[in-house]
Amino acid sequence: MKLADVEERMQKSVEATQHDFNSIRTGRANAALLDRVMVDYYGTETPLRSLANVSTPDATTILIQPYDRSTLASIEKAIQLSDLGLTPNNDGSSVRLNIPPLTTERRKELVKTAAKIAEGGKVAIRNIRRDAIDHIKKAGKAGELTEDEVKDLQEKVQKLTDKYIGKIDALLAEKEKDIMTV
C-alpha cells in the first residue's frame, strides 16, 4: 500500500463529508439540498437532478423546472416525502420551494447533524489509517520492510490522518458558522 493511495482515500473521505454537508439546509436557497431527493419515475427511483433543471433565482427560492411536465406530480411528492421540511408549490410548469428562515432551535439541531456527519468522516479516515498501519505491520513481519521503515511509514500515515481530520474539523467549523449566521 502506497502513501499516495492512503492520501487519496482520505481525500475522498473529506470530499464525501463536504458533499454531505452541502445537503444540510442553512436558511439560504441551495440547489445541493435536492441532491439526495429521489423521484419515482415510471417505477424507477431517479435522482431529481436528472429529471429537472434546478436553479436558485434568489436567496430564499429554489426553482425546479422538469424536462418532462408529466413528472411534476412525482417531483412534488418526492420533495414532500423527503426530510427537508419544505413545501413544494406546483404552478403547472415548475415547482418552487420557498426556504423559510431557520429558528434558533432548528439551527442547533442542524449543527448537531453536521457534527454527526463530521464524526462519520473522521471515522472513515481512522479506518483508512488502521488499514494502512495493518498493511505496514504485515509487510514488516514478512520482512519486506525494516523496523525503521515500518516506524517511519506509520508516522507518515499518522501525519496524513491528522492533516485530513483537521480538514474535516475546518469544514465543520465553517458549516457551523454558516448554519448559525442569521
UniProtKB/Swiss-Prot annotation:
Q: Name one Pfam family in it.
A: RRF
**What keywords tag this UniProt record?**
Cytoplasm, Protein biosynthesis
Q: Where in the cell is it found?
A: Cytoplasm
Task: Provide the Gene Ontology terms for cellular component.
Answer: cytoplasm
Q: What InterPro entries does its record include?
A: Ribosome_recyc_fac (IPR002661), Ribosome_recyc_fac_dom (IPR023584), RRF_sf (IPR036191)
Please give the chief subcellular localization of this protein.
cytoplasm
- Per its UniProt entry, which superkingdom is the organism in? Bacteria
Please give the Gene Ontology molecular function terms for this protein: ribosomal large subunit binding
Answer yes or no on keyword Thylakoid: no
Q: Which GO terms describe its biological process?
A: translational termination
Keyword Zinc-finger present in the record's keywords: the answer is: no
**Position of the signal peptide:** none
User: Which SUPFAM superfamilies does this one have?
Assistant: Ribosome recycling factor, RRF
Q: Which family does it belong to?
A: Belongs to the RRF family.
| Classification via NCBIfam families | frr
Q: Which HAMAP family match?
A: RRF (MF_00040)
As for what it does, the entry says: Responsible for the release of ribosomes from messenger RNA at the termination of protein biosynthesis. May increase the efficiency of translation by recycling ribosomes from one round of translation to another.
What name is this protein filed under? Ribosome-recycling factor
Species of the source = Thermosynechococcus vestitus (strain NIES-2133 / IAM M-273 / BP-1)
